[in-house]
Structure formats: C-alpha cells, structure tokens
Amino acid sequence: MGTIDISYYNLFVGLLLLAIPFFYLWKFKTGLLKPAVIGTLRMIIQLFFIGIYLKYLFLWNNPWINFLWVIVMIFVAGQTALVRTGLKRRILLIPITVGFLCSVILVGLYFIGIVLQLDNIFSAQYFIPIFGILMGNMLSSNVIALNTYYSGLKREQQLYRYLLGNGATRQEAQAPFIKQAIIKSFSPLIANIAVMGLVALPGTMIGQILGGSSPNVSIKYQMMIMVITFTASMLSLMITISLASRRSFDAYGKLLEVSKEAKK
C-alpha cells in the first residue's frame, strides 16, 4: 500500500488547525501573529514551487542539474546565515560557503557512495533529499554556534586578551569560546539522539513507513540520517569557525568589528 494522497480540499481542512496557535498569538498580543501568517503563506508557496521543480528534477535525473541544485541550496543557506547571525559579509560568506560545500560533499557522497553503494551517486531520488537534510541541519547548528562564539568573544574580551597575554596561541585562546559554541549548538541534537524512538518517532522514519518501507529498513535509514547530520554539522562548523576567525582578528589578536550593526 502506497502513501495516501491528500486532496487540496483536505489539505485546506488540515490547515484550519493553524487557527488555534494563531488565536493565542493574537490573544496575548505577542507580535508574532503577522510573522506567523506570512511565514505560513511563504511555506505553502515555496513548497508548491519546490514540488513542481522536484517533479522535473526527478524526471530528468541529470547529474549536472542535481549538483547545480545543491549549489543553489548552499548559496541560499549562506545568505540565510548572514541574515540570522548579523555578521558582515566579508567575515562569514566565504567561510560558511566553503564549510557547507566541503561538508555536504564529503559526508553526503560518503553515505550515498560507500554506505548505500549506489551505482549512480547523483541519482536524484537519493542525492537531492540527503543533501537537503544535511543543509538544513548544518544551517541551524552553524547559526546557533556562530552567534554563541562571537557574542562570547565580545562579552569576554578581557578573558581572551588575558589568555593571549599569558602565552596562549590564538587557537588556544579561542578554544573556550569554541567549546561554548559547540555545547550550545549540539546539546539539543545530542539530547534528541538519546531519546529517539522512545519519546518521538523521527520524521525520516515516519516518511519511509508511510511510503511503504518496512520498519526495519526505516530505522536503519534513520540511524544513518542522524549520524550524517551530526557529522556534517560538526565538520561544517569547524571549517567555518576556522576560516571566519582568520578574518575576525587583527595582527595583534584583537577582535575586529564583525557585526553589521557596528557600522552605525
């Protein structure tokens, strides 16, 4: 039995559930009602367009087009990270783009080529969803970690300079701030991994079961999805911080103005 389709009418009926959270956003004057409505409308429009695009992407199944789509995702993720972190373009754009590109290619192709052992590693059926999952998780973890890293450096400038003054290298002086960034970014992911299957069934597993896969196959895919997202997120963060830090300090190790707001 395949996945049951949802008619457009039934989809509309399902969307009516949003009236509940929208009501409480309005009742308590949170200021989030307008962003929530706009965000929902954007989600609907974007997903419909992506659905149309992916239909032809899967139909063509062209390696060059598939890879171009990944490049587009990386570009959009880089721009999104710039907005969410508030860091200057010259500080973050190249480092996070390189971090995303290297991580998604290394980890994604390792999974598709070595673990799944597909004859065509650029098959749209696997290439696009796997790389999309990796990009989404890398973006979230990088934004949280970079915000924590740079806010910590700004807040604890005296500690950073104290470490440098006592003979620490730049890498050693930056290590406590990188540590805090990793803890803040990856603690939720690690907690989620620990209770997976007990507290909640993950989306990938549910999707595969609804699509007709056996639970045994689904759990193995879910295990690997968690492994590759964890690995790719950590690798991309380390690459991004390493490259961004080289642009964030002067010759004497002093933190430069890295935020866009600093220009005001």
PLM regions with names:
Residues 31-53, 58-70:
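Loop-to-helix transition at the N-terminal end of transmembrane alpha-helices
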